[in-house]
C-alpha cells in the first residue's frame, strides 16, 4: 500500500517563466476547465439512463490529465487510463485538508484507479500512488502539459488506446531524462494522430500503394494521406522530402531537415484537425522556443 500520509514531493520548477505558464495552465488555461463546466458535467452525470448497467472497474493504471473544483470539497478529474481511455470522474472529498486523495491525484505520476458509475462522470472509489516516474521540471514540465492538452483534444471519452497510453508514459520518461523536447513531442504527435485515426502511414502513398522514395517531394493531404507534391497544391500544405517521411515512420528525428520539416508538417496537421482552434500550451512553448 502506498504511503498516503506523506505523499509525493512536488517537482520544483527552475524557470520562473515556465513556472508562471504552468501555473496558468494548471488553473484555468485548458479549454472548458472551469467551475461552471464541472457543475454542468455533474448535472449531465446525474441523468442516469435506467437501462444502462453500472460500471465497476478496479485497479486500472492511469494518469490525471486535469482537475478542477467541484463544490467545496470535491474535484472533477479528467483522467487517461490504459484500457478505458479518457474518463471524467468525481473525487469526493479530495479537497479536504487531510484527504488521503490529495497527495495521490498529481499530474504526470502513474496511479491505480478504481471507479463506479453509470453516467458520463464516474465516481472515484479508490486511488493508489504507483510511482516510478522521474520528476519533471522546467521546459519538460511545460511540454508534459502540452501532451495532456493533446490527449484532451483528440481522445474521445471511454475509448481505450493501450498503445497510446504506453507511448505517453514513455514520452514523460524521455522528457524527465532531458531529451530534446521538440523531437520527443514530434514522436508523440505522430503516434497520437495515428492511434486516434486522424492520420495514416507516413511511409506509403495511399493513392498508388507505393513506398515513399527518399529523394522525392511529398505532401500530406488531410483525410487522404501522403502523395507526391504537385505545383497545384495549396501553398499552406508543407512540402516534405520522402526521407523526412521515412525518418518519421522510424521515429528518427536526428537529421536537421527531418526535425525542421516534421515540425512544419505536424503544425499543419494539428491545426487542420483542430479546425484552427489554438492549443494554449503549444503557443507558450513556441514563444519559449521549445517547439
Swiss-Prot record:
**To which protein family does this belong?**
Belongs to the RecO family.
Q: Which GO terms describe its biological process?
A: DNA recombination; double-strand break repair
Q: What is this protein called?
A: DNA repair protein RecO
Key words of the record: DNA damage, DNA recombination, DNA repair
Q: List the disulfide bonds.
A: none
Q: Does the keyword DNA damage apply?
A: yes
Q: From which residue to which does any coiled coil extend?
A: none
Tell me which domain of life the UniProt entry assigns to the organism this sequence originates from.
Answer: Bacteria
InterPro entries linked to this entry: ARFGAP/RecO, DNA_rep/recomb_RecO_N, NA-bd_OB-fold, RecO, RecO_C
**Stated role:** Involved in DNA repair and RecF pathway recombination.
Q: Name one Pfam family in it.
A: RecO_C
The source organism is Cupriavidus pinatubonensis (strain JMP 134 / LMG 1197)
The opening ranks of the lineage are: Bacteria, Pseudomonadati, Pseudomonadota, Betaproteobacteria, Burkholderiales
Its Gene Ontology cellular component terms are:
bacterial nucleoid
Gene3D superfamilies per record: Nucleic acid-binding proteins, Recombination protein O, C-terminal domain
Amino acid at each position: 500500500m502506498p504511503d498516503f500520509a506523506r505523499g509525493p514531493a512536488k517537482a520544483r520548477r527552475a524557470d520562473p517563466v515556465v513556472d508562471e505558464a504552468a501555473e496558468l495552465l494548471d488553473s484555468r488555461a485548458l479549454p472548458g476547465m472551469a467551475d461552471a463546466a464541472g457543475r454542468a458535467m455533474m448535472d449531465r452525470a446525474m441523468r442516469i439512463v435506467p437501462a444502462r448497467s453500472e460500471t465497476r472497474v478496479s485497479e486500472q493504471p492511469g494518469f490525471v490529465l486535469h482537475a478542477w473544483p467541484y463544490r467545496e470539497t470535491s474535484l472533477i478529474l479528467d483522467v487517461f487510463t490504459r484500457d478505458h481511455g479518457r474518463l471524467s470522474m468525481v473525487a469526493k472529498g479530495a479537497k479536504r485538508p487531510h484527504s488521503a486523495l490529495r497527495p495521490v491525484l498529481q499530474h504526470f505520476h502513474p496511479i491505480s484507479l478504481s471507479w463506479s458509475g453509470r453516467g458520463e462522470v464516474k465516481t472515484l472509489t479508490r486511488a493508489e500512488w504507483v510511482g516510478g516516474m522521474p520528476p519533471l521540471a522546467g521546459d519538460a514540465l511545460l511540454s508534459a502539459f502540452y501532451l495532456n492538452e493533446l490527449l484532451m483534444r483528440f481522445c474521445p471519452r471511454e475509448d481505450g488506446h493501450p498503445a497510446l497510453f504506453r507511448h505517453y508514459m514513455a514520452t514523460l520518461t524521455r522528457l524527465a531524462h532531458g531529451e530534446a523536447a521538440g523531437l520527443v513531442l514530434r514522436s508523440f504527435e505522430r503516434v497520437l494522430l495515428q492511434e486516434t485515426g486522424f492520420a495514416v502511414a507516413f511511409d506509403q502513398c495511399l493513392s498508388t500503394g507505393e513506398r515513399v522514395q527518399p529523394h522525392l517531394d511529398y505532401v500530406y493531404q488531410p483525410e487522404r494521406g501522403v502523395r507526391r507534391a504537385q505545383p497545384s497544391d495549396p501553398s499552406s500544405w508543407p512540402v516534405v522530402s520522402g526521407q523526412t517521411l521515412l525518418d518519421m515512420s522510424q521515429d528518427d528525428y536526428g537529421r536537421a531537415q527531418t526535425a525542421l520539416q516534421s515540425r512544419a508538417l505536424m503544425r499543419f496537421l494539428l491545426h487542420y484537425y483542430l479546425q484552427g482552434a489554438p492549443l494554449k500550451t503549444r503557443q507558450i512553448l513556441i514563444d519559449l522556443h521549445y517547439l
